[in-house]
C-alpha cells in the first residue's frame, strides 16, 4: 500500500502542473495587444495557448485583447509603462 502512495506521488511530480490565468496578452515590451474585433483577439489568444479571447473595449489599457486561461509561459501586461510607445 505504501508503494502505491509513493508511486502516485512520484507520477504527480513528474507530470507537472500547467496552470492558466485570465489576463491581457502582451508583447516583449509590456504592451498589450490592441484590437478592434473579438475575432482578432480570439485568434491571437488561442495561437498562444489560451482557451479563448476577446477585445476588451475601453479597458484598463484601452482596447486590448483579454485572454482566458492563458498559459504561464506567455507574457501578460503588468503594471508599468509600455516600453514600445
Swiss-Prot record:
The keyword Signal applies. It is found in: Secreted. The modification Arginine amide is found at residue 83. Pfam families: Toxin_3. Disulfide bonds join 31-82, 35-55, 41-65, 45-67. Residues 21-83 form the LCN-type CS-alpha/beta domain. Residues 1-19 form the signal peptide. The keyword Aminoacyl-tRNA synthetase does not apply. Expressed by the venom gland. One of its GO terms (cellular component) is extracellular region. One of its GO terms (biological process) is defense response. GO terms for molecular function: sodium channel inhibitor activity; toxin activity. Keywords: Amidation, Disulfide bond, Ion channel impairing toxin, Neurotoxin, Secreted, Signal, Toxin, Voltage-gated sodium channel impairing toxin. Alpha toxins bind voltage-independently at site-3 of sodium channels (Nav) and inhibit the inactivation of the activated channels, thereby blocking neuronal transmission. This toxin is active against insects (para/tipE). Has the structural arrangement of an alpha-helix connected to antiparallel beta-sheets by disulfide bonds (CS-alpha/beta). Belongs to the long (4 C-C) scorpion toxin superfamily. Sodium channel inhibitor family. Alpha subfamily. Negative results: does not affect the mammalian Nav1.2/SCN2A sodium channel. This is Alpha-insect toxin BjaIT. It comes from Hottentotta judaicus. The lineage of its organism: Eukaryota, Metazoa, Ecdysozoa, Arthropoda, Chelicerata.
Amino acid at each position: 500500500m505504501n508503494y502505491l502512495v509513493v508511486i502516485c506521488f512520484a507520477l504527480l511530480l513528474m507530470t507537472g502542473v500547467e496552470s492558466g490565468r485570465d489576463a491581457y496578452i502582451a508583447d516583449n515590451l509590456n504592451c498589450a495587444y490592441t484590437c478592434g474585433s473579438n475575432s482578432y483577439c480570439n485568434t491571437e489568444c488561442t495561437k498562444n495557448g489560451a482557451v479563448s479571447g476577446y477585445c476588451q473595449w475601453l479597458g484598463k489599457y484601452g482596447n486590448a485583447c483579454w485572454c482566458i486561461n492563458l498559459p504561464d509561459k506567455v507574457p501578460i501586461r503588468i503594471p508599468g509603462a509600455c516600453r514600445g510607445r
